[in-house]
Regions:
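Conserved catalytic-site region of short-chain dehydrogenase/reductase
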Residues: 9-11
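Catalytic tyrosine of NAD(P)H-dependent dehydrogenase/reductases that use a Tyr as the general acid/base
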Residues: 19, 27
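Active-site helix of classical SDR
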Residues: 22
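C-terminal helical subdomain
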Residues: 46, 61-98
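Residue(s) in the substrate-gating loop at a strand-loop-helix junction
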Residues: 6
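Short, flexible catalytic-loop segment of classical short-chain dehydrogenase/reductase
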Residues: 49-59
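Alpha-helical segment proximal to the catalytic Tyr-Lys
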Residues: 35-39
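Active-site loop immediately N-terminal to the catalytic Tyr-X3-Lys motif
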Residues: 13-17
């Protein structure tokens, strides 16, 4: 079972907190489901894409490390083959999000506000 989450699940920003909280909820649900299904032969894979170039995102400011649907698909196929429970697309976004997740809140707020010009 492949569950599409988002890098936003790692930490919400002032301008995406509703979206980020729903993705964090999806991550939590998938984690619990994976535990419940352990030993059943059903794998649960959480995919955390960053900004993806699609028709829906046309006209939005492009985020750093943006990716394409085809690139996300490659990551998903690899995760299925390797049975990896959590993957990032692109893979390079994982260390960035790990760093952002561990920043003190005032620093994170200053960084994201400046980046968003908010």
């Amino acid at each position: 079972l492949v569950v599409l989450s988002s890098v936003a699940a790692e930490r919400s920003r002032f301008d995406n907190y509703v979206y980020a909280s729903t993705k964090a909820g999806v991550d939590s649900w998938a984690s619990g489901l994976a535990d419940a299904l352990k030993g059943s032969g059903i794998d649960v894979i959480v995919v955390r894409p960053g900004f993806v170039h699609t028709k829906m995102t046309t006209g939005l400011p492009v985020a750093p490390l943006a990716t394409t649907p085809d690139q996300v698909a490659v990551v998903i196929v690899e995760a299925i083959k390797t049975r990896k429970p959590l993957v990032w697309a692109p893979k390079t976004v994982r260390p960035l999000m790990s760093t952002l997740r561990h920043l003190p809140r005032p620093v994170f707020q200053a960084v994201t506000k400046k980046a968003g010009n908010g």
